[in-house]
A protein has these predicted regions:
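Bacterial N-terminal signal peptides
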Residues: 5-15
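Transmembrane beta-barrel domains of Gram-negative outer membranes and organellar outer membranes
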Residues: 20-287
C-alpha cells in the first residue's frame, strides 16, 4: 500500500513538471505519456475569416471541445485521438459550391473529422543529437460535407519527429525545448474520382521555460501542396504561426495562444484556450 501511494504521488507530481506537451501547439513532441496513464486536453478555438474552398463558404469559426487524448502503452509507444466535438461557422460570404449543401441562414455547424494515430519514440536524445520518433495515423470521415465545413474523406499521414533540449536546467528540465516535424500526408480529393493529393507536412516549435510554472511557446505548422498546379478542392496548402503560453497550477496545465494564417486558404487570425490533465496510473498495459 505504501508503495502504491508513493507511486501515485510521483506520477501526480510529474503532471506538474512534465515538459513539452502539445497544447496549444500543433507540432508533435517526442515525449511519451507514462504507460498506463492518460493525458486529456480540451480547448476552444476562435478563427476569423476561415475558408472552406469545397463549399465556397467563408466566415468566422468557433471550435468547441477541441479534444486531444494521449495514452501510453509502453515506455516508447503512445496512442492518440484528437478532434473537435462541434464546429460552428458564422457565414460572412458564400461563393460557388462544388458539392450540394444543406445550409440555411447565416450559420452552419458540424462534428469534426477525428484523427487516430500512434507515436513511437525510436531514439533517446544525447548530448549532441536529438531524440527521434515516428508518428502515423489516419483521419476518419466523420463530418457531413453538406454542412459546408468538413470534407468527409479518409486521409492518412506519417511524420518524423525530432526534439532537442538546450540551456541551463530549471528544476529537472533544460530551459529550451525545440521540436521539428516533417512528413507526408495523403489526402483524398473529395470531387475527383481515383485522385489524391500528396502534401508535405511540416512543423517547427519551441518551448521556453520562463519559470517553474510558466512556459512561452511558439511554432509554425502546416501542409504544402506538392502539385505543380492548383491543389484539388479540399486539399489546399494551409499553415499557422502561433505564439502563446502554458501555465501549470493545481495539477493542471492551462494554455492560450494567438494564431496567424500563413497561406491564402488559412484563417486570417485566431485565438485558442485550453487545459490539460495528466492522470495517475489507471491501467496496466499488456506485455
Amino acid at each position: 500500500m505504501r508503495l502504491l501511494i508513493l507511486t501515485v504521488l510521483a506520477i501526480a507530481i510529474s503532471a506538474l513538471t512534465a515538459p513539452a506537451q502539445q497544447r496549444p501547439l500543433m507540432t508533435d513532441d517526442i515525449d511519451i505519456t507514462p504507460a498506463g496513464s492518460m493525458e486529456i486536453a480540451a480547448g476552444v478555438d476562435f478563427y476569423q475569416n476561415a475558408k472552406f474552398p469545397l463549399s465556397g463558404i467563408r466566415g468566422d469559426m468557433t471550435r468547441i471541445g477541441d479534444i486531444r487524448i494521449r495514452t501510453g502503452f509502453a515506455a516508447n509507444v503512445e496512442l492518440q485521438i484528437e478532434g473537435t466535438i462541434q464546429n460552428y461557422v458564422a457565414i460572412n460570404s458564400m461563393g460557388p459550391s462544388a458539392i450540394p449543401l444543406n445550409v440555411s441562414g447565416n450559420s452552419t455547424n458540424d462534428f469534426d473529422d477525428f484523427t487516430i494515430s500512434a507515436k513511437v519514440k525510436l531514439r533517446n536524445e544525447t548530448r549532441l543529437l536529438p531524440a527521434v520518433g515516428l508518428k502515423f495515423g489516419y483521419q476518419m470521415p466523420n463530418t457531413d460535407q453538406a454542412r459546408g465545413i468538413g470534407t468527409n474523406q479518409v486521409n492518412i499521414f506519417t511524420k518524423i519527429i525530432l526534439q532537442k533540449k538546450f540551456g541551463d536546467v530549471v528544476g529537472t528540465t533544460p530551459r529550451f525545448n525545440a521540436m521539428g516535424n516533417i512528413g507526408l500526408g495523403i489526402m483524398t480529393a473529395p470531387i475527383e474520382r481515383f485522385t489524391q493529393n500528396d502534401v508535405f507536412l511540416y512543423g517547427l516549435a519551441g518551448i521556453y521555460r520562463a519559470s517553474d510554472h510558466v512556459n512561452i511557446v511558439s511554432e509554425v505548422n502546416g501542409r504544402i501542396n506538392t502539385r505543380n498546379g492548383p491543389a484539388p478542392l479540399g486539399t489546399e496548402s494551409i499553415g499557422q504561426f502561433r505564439v502563446g503560453t502554458q501555465i501549470r497550477a493545481s495539477g493542471l496545465r492551462f494554455d492560450a495562444a494567438a494564431a496567424f494564417g500563413l497561406t491564402s486558404f488559412s484563417p486570417r487570425t485566431g485565438v485558442t484556450f485550453g487545459v490539460t490533465y495528466l492522470s495517475p496510473h489507471i491501467f496496466t498495459p499488456a506485455r
